[in-house]
């Protein structure tokens, strides 16, 4: 046994086998991508930046039921409902999400009965200050308008599994 170990140490077999292993992978195609110039496709269930959606007629979907606020484990959502309208519905006067607190669990999206709050496909929303990560209703509606096509496509792709 000791003679075998001495021969391996003398001829550096581990070093040579490691070198050949490295050379084998050196000439294979690379598994990485050139981010940010190339991006991997994301899943329809990806949970990124939050957005509030609108109906096709332009009216916001949120009915101020506050289910998302109640289910949020991080207590990152704050909603204030306005008075009831003539048709009996309500809308929010304030809808804030503190993205610093948010844990991107997706419970708010699952709890919403009208698919108003969604987590969109955008994952590149780094900021320089914490205040920029405090999203108000206007910012959330702007996100929804910007990403509506991708959000609708992701919801349609995920529909058989809901």
UniProtKB/Swiss-Prot annotation:
The species is: Azorhizobium caulinodans (strain ATCC 43989 / DSM 5975 / JCM 20966 / LMG 6465 / NBRC 14845 / NCIMB 13405 / ORS 571)
| Span of the signal peptide | none
For binding [4Fe-4S] cluster 2, which residues are annotated in this chain's numbering?
Answer: 72, 102, 105, 108
What is the UniProt remark on how the cofactor binds and its stoichiometry?
Binds 2 [4Fe-4S] clusters per subunit.
- From the Swiss-Prot or TrEMBL record, give the protein name: NADH-quinone oxidoreductase subunit I
Q: How does it assemble?
A: NDH-1 is composed of 14 different subunits. Subunits NuoA, H, J, K, L, M, N constitute the membrane sector of the complex.
> What region holds the 4Fe-4S ferredoxin-type domain?
52-82, 93-122
Reported EC number(s) for this entry are 7.1.1.-
The family assignment reads:
Belongs to the complex I 23 kDa subunit family.
Task: Enumerate the HAMAP family for this protein.
Answer: NDH1_NuoI (MF_01351)
Q: Required cofactors, per record? A: [4Fe-4S] cluster
């Amino acid at each position: 046994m000791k003679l075998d170990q001495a021969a391996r140490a003398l001829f550096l077999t581990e070093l040579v086998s490691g070198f050949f292993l490295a050379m084998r992978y050196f000439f294979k195609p690379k598994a990485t991508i050139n981010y940010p110039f190339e991006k991997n496709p994301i899943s329809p269930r990806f949970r990124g930046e939050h957005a509030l959606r609108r109906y096709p007629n332009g009216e916001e979907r949120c009915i101020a039921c506050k289910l998302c606020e109640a289910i949020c484990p991080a207590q990152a959502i704050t909603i204030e409902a306005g008075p009831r309208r003539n048709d009996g519905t309500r809308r929010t006067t304030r809808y804030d999400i503190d993205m610093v607190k948010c844990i991107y669990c997706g419970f708010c999206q699952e709890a919403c009965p009208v698919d108003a709050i969604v987590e969109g496909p955008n994952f590149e929303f780094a900021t320089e200050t914490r205040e920029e990560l405090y999203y108000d209703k206007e910012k959330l509606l702007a996100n929804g308008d910007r990403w509506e096509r991708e959000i609708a496509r992701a919801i349609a792709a995920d529909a058989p599994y809901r």
